[in-house]
């Protein structure tokens, strides 16, 4: 009898855990006028011309379930009623460095959202493994979207910047739910990264990746798309954007990835700009390119 009860309990425990994957726990409106961003986007308490499009958007801080954890994130919705394609935005940085905040989401995705997209992004779990278990925090957003009335859970794209490129490539390796993706100045080869920036190994990799020194080669390869481009979802497509003057992510490895994708006949495009890691002097071009790609490959795709 006890064995039967234990089996029943275990069944319901697993069922509950599966059902709760990505569950939206909270959704709270962000009043932009009460945030530090307001001083940058406004003048005399009125939105500047370059940011007038923000009037058409609602911003929310969210929490959702991923594995047994509660994860923080940000959600952007058009104010206008409707059901819109969803783009998951993957932030760069690690741990508390360069977290996903209102400023970042505005800089990279607000022009896209204003044109009829729901944007959702994760701040990843506190125990950041730099491409490890926190991948679930990204993938589980495909379930969270099912609880967002304005989001179409059957029409999901992804946009990753810098370290967010690692998360995007890993997502395309582990899921067929992403119809198309964009990676901007993404990291493709962590071996090259630590050669170019040795402090990234001691201050980030060794601290974030479990058993790093013992399993270094295996763990870096697991996070480096250059070693497994053939495993990217064939159901998806990819736009890779590169800044030639990027000092943070080696763009030579990006061109090597592009060559491999070409050999594999993967559905991709590659665009290169003379700019830095943040596209500082090419923001308008970046916004237009991102919108054009998602319109063509997500919103109006056959």
List each language-model region with its residue ranges.
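C-terminal catalytic histidine-bearing segment of alpha/beta-hydrolase fold enzymes
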Residues: 91, 248, 255-302
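Short substrate-entry loop that stabilizes the transition state in hydrolases
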Residues: 82-84, 89-130
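Primarily recognizes the serine-hydrolase "nucleophile elbow" in alpha/beta-hydrolase
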Residues: 140-197
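Short, proline-enriched alpha-helix->beta-strand connector loops that line the catalytic pocket
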Residues: 231-238, 264-266
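Catalytic nucleophile-loop/oxyanion-hole region of alpha/beta-hydrolase
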Residues: 108, 121-152, 281
């Amino acid at each position: 009898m006890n064995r039967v009860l234990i089996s029943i309990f275990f069944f319901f425990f697993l069922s509950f855990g599966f059902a709760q994957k990505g569950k939206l726990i909270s959704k709270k409106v962000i009043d932009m006028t009460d945030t530090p961003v307001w001083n940058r986007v406004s003048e005399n308490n009125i939105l500047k011309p370059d940011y007038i499009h923000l009037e058409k958007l609602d911003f929310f801080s969210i929490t959702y379930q991923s594995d047994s954890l509660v994860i923080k994130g940000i959600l952007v919705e058009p104010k206008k009623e409707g059901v819109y394609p969803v783009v998951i935005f993957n932030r760069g940085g690690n741990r508390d460095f360069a977290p996903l905040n209102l400023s970042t989401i505005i800089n990279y995705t607000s022009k896209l959202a204003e044109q009829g997209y729901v944007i959702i992004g994760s701040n990843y779990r506190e125990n950041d493994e730099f491409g490890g278990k926190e991948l679930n925090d990204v993938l589980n957003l495909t379930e969270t979207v099912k609880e967002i009335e304005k989001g179409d859970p059957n029409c999901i794209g992804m946009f990753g910047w810098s370290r967010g490129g690692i998360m995007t490539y890993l997502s395309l390796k582990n899921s067929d739910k992403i119809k198309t993706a964009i990676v901007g100045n993404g990291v493709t080869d962590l071996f090259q990264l630590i050669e170019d920036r040795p402090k990234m190994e001691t201050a980030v990799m060794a601290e974030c990746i479990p058993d790093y020194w013992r399993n270094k080669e295996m763990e870096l390869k697991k996070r480096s798309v250059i070693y497994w481009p053939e495993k990217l979802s064939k159901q998806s497509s990819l736009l890779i954007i590169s800044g030639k003057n990027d000092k943070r992510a080696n763009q030579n490895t990006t061109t090597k990835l592009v060559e491999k994708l070409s050999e594999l006949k993967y559905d991709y495009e590659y665009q290169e700009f003379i700019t830095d890691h943040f596209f500082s002097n090419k923001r308008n071009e970046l916004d237009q390119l991102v919108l054009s790609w998602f319109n063509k490959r997500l919103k109006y795709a056959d």
